[in-house]
A protein has these predicted regions:
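Intrinsically disordered, low-complexity regulatory regions of eukaryotic proteins
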Residues: 1-126
């Protein structure tokens, strides 16, 4: 009988996780959030990540935008940060701050931290 290795894509090894697996655990790949959690926390983390779809999508979209388009008008189009202000119109705490309107990486990191908070892996700063 020939051993066939299961082909794993780039998804997180945690069952049902919507994130990409970017950290090796010695054979399987997990996302940064499951890497921070103990295995008994994985179902709760997965559920929180799935529930935060708008934040996950926003992170992916922010990563695709160049720094110039993010912070200033280009060819008559408004700065891209305005799209995210509108996306989170009902959640002003998730809109870009004044500093993040200039530095998109700061905004991306804050959204990533928001996912960690929602997954119970980080605490909100007061």
């Amino acid at each position: 009988m020939k051993y066939e290795e299961k082909e794993q894509g780039h998804e997180c090894f945690a069952n049902g996780c919507p994130m990409a697996g970017g950290i090796s655990t010695g054979g399987n790949w997990v996302c940064a959030y499951h890497n921070q959690a103990t295995s008994d926390q994985w179902p709760r983390v997965t559920e929180a990540l799935r529930d935060a779809e708008a934040v996950r999508v926003a992170i992916n979209e922010v990563m695709k935008i160049d720094m110039i388009s993010w912070g200033s008008a280009v060819n008559g189009y408004p700065p891209k940060w305005q799209e995210f202000a509108a996306l989170f119109d009902d959640y002003p705490e998730l809109q870009p701050t004044e500093h993040e309107k200039i530095r998109k990486t700061k905004y991306e990191y804050r959204l990533r931290n928001e996912l960690a908070i929602r997954a119970g892996l980080a605490k909100r700063k007061l």
